[in-house]
Amino acid sequence: MNSLKRYKIIFLVPIFEREDCVEDLIQNIHTICPNSAILFHINSNCSQTFVDNINKLKNHYDFCYILPEKYPSEWASGFLTNIYIQMMNWCIENDISDYIYITHSNSLLINPKLESFIYSHEIFFPLPGTKHSGDWWEKILLDQNILDYVKPLGDMIYVTSIEGAAMNLKVAQHFVDDLIKVIPNINVEYPSEEYYIPTSFMKIKDRYRYMNCALERWGHTVDHVVNGYKLGVSKNEEYILNIVLNNQFDVLSKLNLYSIKKIERKYNYPFRELLRNHFGYNNVIF
Protein backbone atom coordinates (compact mmCIF):
# COMPACT_ATOMS: atom_id res chain seq x y z
CA MET A 1 0.00 0.00 0.00
CA ASN A 2 1.40 3.38 -0.99
CA SER A 3 2.12 5.64 1.98
CA LEU A 4 3.65 8.52 0.01
CA LYS A 5 1.92 11.80 -0.61
CA ARG A 6 0.28 12.09 -4.04
CA TYR A 7 1.11 14.92 -6.44
CA LYS A 8 -0.11 16.35 -9.72
CA ILE A 9 3.23 15.92 -11.52
CA ILE A 10 6.50 14.23 -10.68
CA PHE A 11 9.57 15.46 -12.53
CA LEU A 12 12.15 12.82 -13.49
CA VAL A 13 15.63 14.34 -13.20
CA PRO A 14 18.96 12.52 -13.65
CA ILE A 15 21.70 14.45 -11.81
CA PHE A 16 25.47 14.23 -11.58
CA GLU A 17 26.95 17.59 -10.55
CA ARG A 18 26.57 20.99 -8.88
CA GLU A 19 24.55 20.67 -5.70
CA ASP A 20 23.78 24.40 -5.76
CA CYS A 21 22.19 24.09 -9.21
CA VAL A 22 20.27 20.98 -8.14
CA GLU A 23 18.81 22.96 -5.25
CA ASP A 24 18.11 25.85 -7.61
CA LEU A 25 16.07 23.45 -9.75
CA ILE A 26 14.24 22.14 -6.66
CA GLN A 27 13.29 25.67 -5.67
CA ASN A 28 12.31 26.49 -9.25
CA ILE A 29 10.01 23.47 -9.61
CA HIS A 30 8.39 23.88 -6.20
CA THR A 31 7.73 27.58 -6.75
CA ILE A 32 6.22 27.19 -10.21
CA CYS A 33 4.50 23.82 -9.64
CA PRO A 34 3.82 23.75 -5.87
CA ASN A 35 1.66 20.61 -6.04
CA SER A 36 4.36 18.53 -7.69
CA ALA A 37 7.37 16.40 -6.72
CA ILE A 38 10.80 15.44 -8.03
CA LEU A 39 12.41 12.02 -8.46
CA PHE A 40 16.19 12.16 -8.81
CA HIS A 41 18.54 9.58 -10.22
CA ILE A 42 22.13 9.97 -9.02
CA ASN A 43 24.89 8.98 -11.44
CA SER A 44 26.74 5.93 -10.10
CA ASN A 45 30.04 7.64 -10.95
CA CYS A 46 29.38 10.53 -8.56
CA SER A 47 31.45 11.04 -5.43
CA GLN A 48 30.13 9.99 -2.04
CA THR A 49 30.21 13.65 -1.04
CA PHE A 50 27.80 14.49 -3.85
CA VAL A 51 25.52 11.58 -2.87
CA ASP A 52 25.54 12.74 0.76
CA ASN A 53 24.70 16.30 -0.27
CA ILE A 54 21.78 15.20 -2.44
CA ASN A 55 20.47 13.20 0.51
CA LYS A 56 20.64 16.39 2.57
CA LEU A 57 18.46 18.07 -0.02
CA LYS A 58 16.02 15.14 -0.04
CA ASN A 59 15.74 15.24 3.74
CA HIS A 60 15.10 18.99 3.72
CA TYR A 61 12.59 19.06 0.85
CA ASP A 62 9.91 16.48 1.57
CA PHE A 63 8.66 16.46 -2.04
CA CYS A 64 12.02 15.14 -3.32
CA TYR A 65 12.76 11.44 -3.77
CA ILE A 66 15.78 9.45 -4.97
CA LEU A 67 15.65 6.35 -7.17
CA PRO A 68 17.36 3.54 -5.21
CA GLU A 69 19.14 2.14 -8.28
CA LYS A 70 22.20 3.94 -9.65
CA TYR A 71 23.64 3.72 -13.17
CA PRO A 72 26.15 5.74 -15.18
CA SER A 73 24.06 8.56 -16.64
CA GLU A 74 26.43 10.30 -19.00
CA TRP A 75 24.49 11.31 -22.10
CA ALA A 76 26.02 8.83 -24.56
CA SER A 77 26.40 5.90 -22.18
CA GLY A 78 23.13 4.29 -23.24
CA PHE A 79 21.92 3.81 -19.68
CA LEU A 80 19.39 6.65 -19.72
CA THR A 81 16.70 4.44 -21.27
CA ASN A 82 17.09 2.09 -18.33
CA ILE A 83 17.13 5.00 -15.89
CA TYR A 84 13.94 6.61 -17.21
CA ILE A 85 12.08 3.29 -17.36
CA GLN A 86 13.14 2.45 -13.80
CA MET A 87 12.00 5.91 -12.71
CA MET A 88 8.63 5.46 -14.43
CA ASN A 89 8.24 2.08 -12.77
CA TRP A 90 9.04 3.56 -9.35
CA CYS A 91 6.36 6.22 -9.88
CA ILE A 92 3.79 3.61 -10.92
CA GLU A 93 4.57 1.28 -8.02
CA ASN A 94 4.23 4.16 -5.55
CA ASP A 95 1.21 5.67 -7.35
CA ILE A 96 2.77 9.02 -6.54
CA SER A 97 1.37 11.39 -9.16
CA ASP A 98 -1.12 11.92 -11.94
CA TYR A 99 1.57 12.78 -14.49
CA ILE A 100 5.27 12.24 -15.17
CA TYR A 101 7.44 14.96 -16.75
CA ILE A 102 10.84 14.06 -18.20
CA THR A 103 13.46 16.76 -17.78
CA HIS A 104 17.13 17.22 -16.87
CA SER A 105 19.33 18.95 -14.34
CA ASN A 106 20.16 21.82 -16.71
CA SER A 107 16.49 22.67 -17.31
CA LEU A 108 14.24 25.21 -15.57
CA LEU A 109 10.48 25.70 -15.44
CA ILE A 110 9.14 29.03 -16.66
CA ASN A 111 5.34 28.68 -16.88
CA PRO A 112 3.15 28.26 -13.77
CA LYS A 113 0.19 27.17 -15.91
CA LEU A 114 1.74 23.71 -16.34
CA GLU A 115 -0.08 22.03 -13.43
CA SER A 116 -3.48 22.83 -14.93
CA PHE A 117 -2.59 22.47 -18.62
CA ILE A 118 -1.07 19.01 -18.33
CA TYR A 119 -4.48 17.38 -17.79
CA SER A 120 -5.56 18.34 -21.33
CA HIS A 121 -3.87 15.28 -22.91
CA GLU A 122 -2.69 11.86 -21.84
CA ILE A 123 0.75 12.22 -23.39
CA PHE A 124 2.85 15.06 -24.79
CA PHE A 125 5.56 13.79 -27.11
CA PRO A 126 7.20 15.23 -30.25
CA LEU A 127 6.50 13.05 -33.27
CA PRO A 128 9.89 11.45 -33.97
CA GLY A 129 11.65 11.04 -37.28
CA THR A 130 13.26 7.86 -38.57
CA LYS A 131 16.92 6.95 -38.28
CA HIS A 132 18.83 5.37 -41.18
CA SER A 133 22.35 6.81 -40.99
CA GLY A 134 24.42 9.63 -39.53
CA ASP A 135 25.48 10.24 -35.94
CA TRP A 136 25.52 7.15 -33.71
CA TRP A 137 24.43 4.85 -36.57
CA GLU A 138 27.45 2.54 -36.29
CA LYS A 139 26.89 2.19 -32.54
CA ILE A 140 23.19 1.48 -33.08
CA LEU A 141 24.00 -1.32 -35.53
CA LEU A 142 26.10 -2.95 -32.80
CA ASP A 143 23.15 -2.93 -30.37
CA GLN A 144 21.43 -6.24 -31.10
CA ASN A 145 18.72 -5.42 -28.55
CA ILE A 146 17.33 -2.51 -30.54
CA LEU A 147 17.67 -4.38 -33.85
CA ASP A 148 15.60 -7.25 -32.44
CA TYR A 149 13.14 -4.80 -30.85
CA VAL A 150 12.30 -3.04 -34.12
CA LYS A 151 11.85 -6.16 -36.28
CA PRO A 152 8.05 -6.20 -35.70
CA LEU A 153 8.03 -2.52 -36.76
CA GLY A 154 9.53 -3.21 -40.16
CA ASP A 155 13.01 -2.45 -38.79
CA MET A 156 12.08 1.22 -38.33
CA ILE A 157 14.08 3.04 -35.65
CA TYR A 158 12.65 6.38 -34.55
CA VAL A 159 14.57 9.24 -32.94
CA THR A 160 13.87 12.45 -31.03
CA SER A 161 14.95 14.22 -27.86
CA ILE A 162 12.63 13.30 -24.97
CA GLU A 163 13.14 16.16 -22.49
CA GLY A 164 9.79 17.86 -22.08
CA ALA A 165 7.81 14.70 -22.80
CA ALA A 166 5.02 14.17 -20.26
CA MET A 167 2.41 11.47 -19.70
CA ASN A 168 -0.06 10.10 -17.20
CA LEU A 169 0.73 6.91 -15.29
CA LYS A 170 -1.40 4.75 -17.58
CA VAL A 171 0.76 5.73 -20.55
CA ALA A 172 3.92 5.31 -18.48
CA GLN A 173 2.83 1.75 -17.69
CA HIS A 174 2.77 1.00 -21.43
CA PHE A 175 6.34 2.26 -21.80
CA VAL A 176 7.45 0.14 -18.86
CA ASP A 177 5.68 -2.99 -20.13
CA ASP A 178 7.05 -2.48 -23.64
CA LEU A 179 10.67 -1.70 -22.77
CA ILE A 180 11.64 -3.08 -19.38
CA LYS A 181 12.73 -6.47 -20.79
CA VAL A 182 14.61 -5.11 -23.81
CA ILE A 183 16.37 -1.97 -22.62
CA PRO A 184 20.17 -2.03 -22.63
CA ASN A 185 21.84 -2.75 -19.31
CA ILE A 186 25.31 -2.18 -20.74
CA ASN A 187 27.16 0.82 -22.13
CA VAL A 188 26.01 0.91 -25.77
CA GLU A 189 27.88 4.19 -26.33
CA TYR A 190 25.00 6.15 -27.83
CA PRO A 191 22.06 8.08 -26.28
CA SER A 192 19.70 5.10 -26.30
CA GLU A 193 16.79 7.01 -24.73
CA GLU A 194 16.49 9.07 -27.93
CA TYR A 195 15.80 5.85 -29.88
CA TYR A 196 14.15 3.24 -27.65
CA ILE A 197 11.59 5.55 -26.04
CA PRO A 198 10.53 7.35 -29.29
CA THR A 199 10.25 4.00 -31.07
CA SER A 200 8.07 2.68 -28.25
CA PHE A 201 5.97 5.85 -28.48
CA MET A 202 5.24 5.12 -32.15
CA LYS A 203 3.86 1.73 -31.11
CA ILE A 204 1.42 3.10 -28.53
CA LYS A 205 0.60 6.67 -29.55
CA ASP A 206 -2.75 6.00 -31.23
CA ARG A 207 -4.17 4.48 -28.05
CA TYR A 208 -4.11 7.82 -26.24
CA ARG A 209 -4.98 11.50 -26.57
CA TYR A 210 -1.58 12.87 -27.44
CA MET A 211 -0.19 16.27 -28.36
CA ASN A 212 2.60 16.30 -30.91
CA CYS A 213 5.05 18.47 -28.99
CA ALA A 214 7.54 18.55 -26.16
CA LEU A 215 6.76 21.01 -23.37
CA GLU A 216 10.43 21.94 -23.07
CA ARG A 217 12.51 23.87 -25.61
CA TRP A 218 16.16 24.75 -26.15
CA GLY A 219 17.21 27.99 -24.50
CA HIS A 220 20.66 28.45 -26.03
CA THR A 221 19.55 28.54 -29.69
CA VAL A 222 16.84 30.29 -31.69
CA ASP A 223 14.20 27.92 -33.06
CA HIS A 224 11.99 28.55 -36.08
CA VAL A 225 9.06 29.82 -34.00
CA VAL A 226 11.01 32.51 -32.15
CA ASN A 227 13.06 33.34 -35.25
CA GLY A 228 9.79 33.98 -37.08
CA TYR A 229 9.14 36.98 -34.85
CA LYS A 230 12.33 38.64 -36.24
CA LEU A 231 13.28 40.08 -32.87
CA GLY A 232 17.01 39.98 -33.43
CA VAL A 233 17.68 37.74 -30.42
CA SER A 234 20.45 35.15 -30.46
CA LYS A 235 18.88 32.76 -27.94
CA ASN A 236 15.37 31.56 -27.14
CA GLU A 237 16.04 32.39 -23.50
CA GLU A 238 16.40 36.10 -24.34
CA TYR A 239 12.94 36.13 -25.94
CA ILE A 240 11.42 33.90 -23.26
CA LEU A 241 12.80 35.98 -20.42
CA ASN A 242 10.99 39.10 -21.60
CA ILE A 243 7.70 37.18 -21.65
CA VAL A 244 8.28 35.77 -18.16
CA LEU A 245 9.29 39.11 -16.66
CA ASN A 246 6.06 40.61 -18.01
CA ASN A 247 4.03 37.67 -16.61
CA GLN A 248 2.65 36.93 -20.10
CA PHE A 249 2.24 33.23 -19.40
CA ASP A 250 -0.65 32.90 -21.87
CA VAL A 251 1.89 33.67 -24.61
CA LEU A 252 4.10 30.83 -23.41
CA SER A 253 1.09 28.52 -23.24
CA LYS A 254 0.21 29.26 -26.87
CA LEU A 255 3.74 28.13 -27.75
CA ASN A 256 3.31 24.99 -25.58
CA LEU A 257 6.34 26.21 -23.67
CA TYR A 258 6.70 25.29 -20.00
CA SER A 259 10.41 24.67 -19.42
CA ILE A 260 13.70 25.35 -21.17
CA LYS A 261 16.89 23.32 -21.27
CA LYS A 262 20.62 23.70 -21.66
CA ILE A 263 20.76 26.33 -18.91
CA GLU A 264 24.35 26.54 -17.73
CA ARG A 265 25.01 24.75 -14.45
CA LYS A 266 26.31 27.88 -12.75
CA TYR A 267 24.29 29.21 -9.82
CA ASN A 268 25.02 32.82 -10.77
CA TYR A 269 24.25 32.34 -14.46
CA PRO A 270 22.19 35.47 -15.36
CA PHE A 271 19.11 33.59 -16.59
CA ARG A 272 18.95 31.65 -13.31
CA GLU A 273 19.35 34.83 -11.29
CA LEU A 274 16.61 36.64 -13.19
CA LEU A 275 14.17 33.75 -12.72
CA ARG A 276 14.99 33.54 -9.00
CA ASN A 277 14.44 37.25 -8.54
CA HIS A 278 11.22 37.26 -10.55
CA PHE A 279 9.57 34.24 -8.93
CA GLY A 280 11.06 34.91 -5.48
CA TYR A 281 12.98 31.78 -4.54
CA ASN A 282 16.52 31.13 -3.26
CA ASN A 283 18.65 28.26 -2.04
CA VAL A 284 18.72 27.59 1.69
CA ILE A 285 21.36 24.82 1.92
CA PHE A 286 23.92 25.21 -0.90
Protein language model regions, located:
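N-proximal low-complexity "stem/linker" segments adjacent to membrane-targeting elements
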Residues: M1-E23
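Short, acidic, metal-binding catalytic loop of nucleotide-sugar glycosyltransferases
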Residues: Q27-S36
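Short beta-strand/loop segment that forms part of the nucleotide-sugar
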Residues: N35-S47, L67-K70
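Active-site-proximal specificity loops/subdomain of glycosyltransferases
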Residues: F50-S97
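Conserved glycosyltransferase catalytic-site signature
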Residues: S77-I85, S107, Y190-P198
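Short beta-strand-to-loop acidic/aromatic patch adjacent to the donor-nucleotide binding site
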Residues: S97-N106
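Conserved catalytic core of nucleotide-sugar-dependent glycosyltransferases
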Residues: L108-I186, Y190, E194
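C-terminal catalytic/acceptor-binding lobe
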Residues: P184-F286
